[in-house]
């Protein structure tokens, strides 16, 4: 069995057709959900971004003892467990805190791809393409494919095309959607 875990930060299930919303149209996500394991009663243990990632990685309720900190060295991660039984483990993310400040959230992944998206300066040539808009890098995003989440999913898809015949655990974590 292969596992693809897609993190949708701050994305409310009640806004998806797959979970009963009749007004908002989400056909692509609904189609994915129809072929996937869905959790009807999943509750987060930690609210902030990285403590939630620690919960994902370790299966533990981490907010009460570690907060927004690096993963502890001695803490076993899901990626380590799956790698230990022969899975190729990979993560693709644009969430900026995985590697910042020795956060150690790449622990156990044999392949780890960090799209600089949310944490890097936009390419200089794009910043100056649109006059007077360089103060907000999002102003340079003219096409959907310029945005961080699509670029993260393209990278994940490329990895999947190369490794689909293997036993794998692919963890995909785009930062979007985020702030309210």
Region locations from a protein language model:
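Catalytic domains that recognize anionic headgroups
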Residues: 1-180
């Amino acid at each position: 069995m292969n596992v693809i875990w897609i993190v949708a930060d701050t994305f409310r299930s009640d806004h998806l057709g797959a979970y009963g919303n009749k007004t908002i149209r989400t056909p692509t996500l609904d189609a994915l959900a129809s072929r996937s394991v869905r959790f009807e009663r999943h509750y987060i243990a930690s609210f902030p971004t990285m403590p939630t990632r620690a919960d994902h990685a370790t299966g533990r309720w981490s907010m009460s003892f570690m907060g927004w900190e690096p993963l502890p060295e001695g803490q076993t991660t899901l990626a380590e467990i799956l790698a230990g039984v022969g899975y190729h483990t990979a993560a693709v993310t644009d969430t900026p805190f995985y590697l910042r400040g020795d956060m150690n959230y790449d622990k156990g992944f044999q392949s780890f791809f960090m799209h600089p998206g949310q944490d890097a300066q936009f390419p200089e040539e794009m910043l100056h393409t649109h006059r007077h808009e360089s103060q907000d890098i999002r102003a340079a995003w003219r096409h959907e494919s310029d945005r961080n989440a699509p670029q993260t999913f393209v990278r994940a898809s490329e990895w999947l095309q190369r490794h689909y015949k293997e036993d794998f655990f692919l963890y995909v974590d785009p930062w979007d959607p985020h702030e309210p």
